[in-house]
Curated annotation (Swiss-Prot):
Gene: rps2
Localization: Plastid, Chloroplast
Primary location group: plastid
Protein name: Small ribosomal subunit protein uS2c
GO BP terms, alphabetized: translation
Upper taxonomic lineage: Eukaryota, Viridiplantae, Streptophyta, Embryophyta, Tracheophyta
InterPro entries named in the record: Ribosomal_uS2, Ribosomal_uS2_bac/mit/plastid, Ribosomal_uS2_flav_dom_sf
GO cellular component: chloroplast; mitochondrial small ribosomal subunit
Length: 235
């Protein structure tokens, strides 16, 4: 694994509020190695641990990107949907930022069928084919297209299972995380003080509620992937 300087500074993390955990009564004891202290009933994360693990995660995705690996970013909470799209587009990653369809990965054959249907409908819409259909039939197809785009738009060019998944919230994306675990897909996940770090391959201790925190972490990972892609090996 190639080590690089990703400018993961404590001041930047503090300004982004990455160190703020949940109230002390809402915690998972497995997170104790990553907790620095408590303040006014709130756990404060140890940012030196966050810096170490985020740096390791950046090194990992950089090396994977150099090898031409594919990434999937997942974040479906309202406050992060646009952040997921932004980070994914910057780093040419696939993403899910709306509803996660159960079986998206574990039932990949069905997902491929849905993707083909989505692409067929999208092409038909682009060519104006809906305009030549009866209104009721056109409305049904347009409704299907909207629903499929919401769930599959970010993975429409994903031709196979991803090599690495980046997940922003362990609880919100528990099904996605479980599917990755079943399939042996390595996961990088932000873990707040109420999370179980044992459920992910590379935990990044951090505030998984604040936009500023999630954006800061995603930006670092997206930068590492982008730099890796610019150094991609040609075989």
């Amino acid at each position: 694994m190639q080590q690089k300087n990703w400018t993961i500074d404590l001041e930047g993390m503090m300004a982004a509020g990455i160190h703020f955990g949940h109230q002390t009564q809402r915690w998972n004891p497995k997170m104790s190695p990553y907790i620095f202290t408590e303040r006014k009933g709130v756990h404060i994360l140890d940012l030196t641990q966050t810096a170490r693990l985020l740096s390791e995660a950046c090194d990992l995705v950089f090396d994977a990107a150099v090898e031409g690996k594919e990434f999937l970013m997942v974040g479906t909470k309202n406050q992060v949907t646009d952040l997921i799209v932004s980070a994914a587009l910057k780093s040419q990653c696939h993403y899910v930022n709306e509803k996660w369809l159960a079986g998206t990965l574990t039932n990949w054959v069905t997902t491929e069928t849905r993707l083909r249907r989505f692409q067929h409908l999208q092409t038909g819409g682009d060519l104006g084919e809906f305009d030549r259909l009866p209104k009721r039939e056109a409305a049904i197809l347009k409704g299907q297209l909207v629903r499929l785009k919401k769930c599959l738009g970010g993975i429409q060019y994903m031709s196979d299972l991803p090599d690495i998944a980046i997940i922003t919230d362990q609880h919100e994306q528990s099904i996605a995380l479980k599917e990755c675990s079943i399939l042996g897909i390595p996961t990088i996940c932000i873990v707040d003080t109420d999370c179980d770090p044992d459920l992910v391959d590379v935990p990044i201790p951090g505030n998984d509620d604040a936009r500023s925190s999630i954006r800061w972490i995603l930006d670092k990972l997206a930068l590492a992937i982008s730099e890796g892609r610019s150094n991609i090996k040609v075989t």
